[in-house]
Structures are given as C-alpha cells and as structure tokens.
Amino acid sequence: MILTVTLNPAIDVSYPLDELKCDTVNRVVDVTKTPGGKGLNVCRVLNDFGETVKATGCIGGESGDFIINHLPDSILSRFYKISGDTRTCIAILHEGNQTEILEKGPLLSVNEIDGFTHHFKYLLNDVDVVTLSDSLPAGMPDDYYQKLIGIANLNGKKTVLDCSGNALEAVLKGDSKPTVIKPNLEELSQLLGKEMTKDFDALKEVLQDKLFDGIEWIIVSLGADGVFAKHKDTFYKVDIPKIKIVSAVGSGDSTVAGIASGLANDEDDRALLTKANVLGMLNAQEKTTGHVNMANYDKLYQSIKVKEV
C-alpha cells in the first residue's frame, strides 16, 4: 500500500472567461471545483493505475469536508482534522492566460502539528511507500518533512519527496534521507546556487555532490526532453516521444505516482523509470489534473527509451 501526504491541500477552483476585465464584474458560467494539492494528484493517479492507496494530510472546515467527499471511494481517506479552514486556490483562465490567486492556508498550532505526527506514525503500519508532496502549511517548521522521513525510515518505509525551497534544503542538510527526490532543473539550480543545463556531464558531477549523500534515487525532470536519473552509482537518461499535450499541470505528480508504484512493487531501474514517465505523459494528455487513461499505457510504455549513460 502507498500513503500519500498532502499537508496543505486546497480546493482548486477554475473560472474560465473569454476576457478578464479589471475593476468591474466578471460573470462565470462554468465553474469547476476539485480537491487540489500535489499529493492528492498523486493519490488519484495511483488509484487510476489500480494501486491500493490511502491519503492523509491536514484539513479543516467545510473546505476540508469537500475534499473528503470528492475523492474517489476507492481511496482510503485518513486525513487529520484541524481547526482552521482548508485553503482555496483560484485559477482564472482568460485569453490564453492563467491568472492564479492562491490562499496561504491555515495556521497550525503546536498541538495540531504534534497530533498529526502521531497520526502519521499510526498510518505507517500497513504501507510500503510514503509520498510527501508540496509546501508546508503555516506553523510547521521547515524541517518537518525531515521529521516525517525519519519516522518512516525507522519503520522501514520507502519515501518519495517532491518539494522545493527551504523544506527541501532542510531535508538535504538533515540526517534522515528520503529514498527518492525529484527536482527539476530550476529547483536544482536554486539548491546549488548556479544555473544548471541539460548537459549530461555537468548533471553527473552535481548529482555526486555531498549535498545528495544518502539519497538512493535522484530523478531530474528535463521537461519534454525526458529525465536524467541517478540510482546509487548508476546514471540513466530517459527519452520520451513527442505527444500532443492537453495540459501539463499535474504531470510531475503523476511521475511521482509512477515512482511510488515502482518502489512498492520492487521493480528494476528501467521499469520504474519507464512507468514513471508513462504516467506523467498520460496525465499531460488529459484535461483533468491528476488523471490518467490506462487505455494508452502499453503503447506509450513501448516508446520510452531508458539508457545507461
């Protein structure tokens, strides 16, 4: 079983407009509301793929109830209730653009943070892999993912971390290491303080930096150019075919789902990398974020090329 953790989920609201007019009323006919957050995208894709998955995180208020009520019944909902209201994130789609208004989310108390920590420990009993995705809510210290990873490691669970900024830096500088991290080139550049390119030799060199010691897998997204990955002392380049992209939103989360599935099923390197990239591409072919159409899985799987470099 796979446990997905979304500590700061949201209701994602989409407002499509022909034109966004400022300082006046804009009326919307077709409003879409869905449970949002990177970890929730991961769990929906895992569910589409047929994995047994349970979802946790911190939710509160009517918005939190909305999230629970709008997840598929086959996903085991194990969220931790807090006093604050779960946030709302608004995307205004207008004239080929997307303008976003993102709430910060609730402020968690020390007691609520401690309560979730105990809740997390309890949820580990029957899981093999844990995914940790997205930003931390207000009130949680930067090293909180480091704490959860330490707990998972003590219980023999594999972890996939997909975050950035201070939270990622705290994990890399801490004692407890995740099984997998999945930065993109921009995040890698921020971590290392220098501009990173798709040059293989340069990527090989930086992924052997002491900053990444103890991390079994480092999987770097190269966008349409596929993936560059390091597993222990072996490096891989993953080439992907060109596809018609409907929406790339959530494709990174779908890739995380594939990584988690590969770990949970003890798949070899090539199978894990292939599955992860296929699920990412399948999501990009869908209008709905965090969804894959498995009818196209086998065809795409055969088109992925994984080579050792």
From Swiss-Prot:
Q: Which reaction(s) does the protein catalyse, per the Swiss-Prot or TrEMBL entry?
A: D-tagatofuranose 6-phosphate + ATP = D-tagatofuranose 1,6-bisphosphate + ADP + H(+)
List the Gene3D superfamilies hit by this protein, alphabetically.
Answer: 3.40.1190.20
Q: Does the keyword Transmembrane helix apply?
A: no
Q: Which UniProt keywords apply?
A: ATP-binding, Kinase, Lactose metabolism, Nucleotide-binding, Transferase
Q: In which pathway does it act?
A: Carbohydrate metabolism; D-tagatose 6-phosphate degradation; D-glyceraldehyde 3-phosphate and glycerone phosphate from D-tagatose 6-phosphate: step 1/2
The broad enzyme category this protein falls into is transferase
Q: What is its EC number?
A: 2.7.1.144
Q: Which GO terms describe its cellular component?
A: cytosol
Report the family membership: Belongs to the carbohydrate kinase PfkB family. LacC subfamily.
* The protein's name in its UniProt record: Tagatose-6-phosphate kinase
Lineage here is:
Bacteria, Bacillati, Bacillota, Bacilli, Lactobacillales
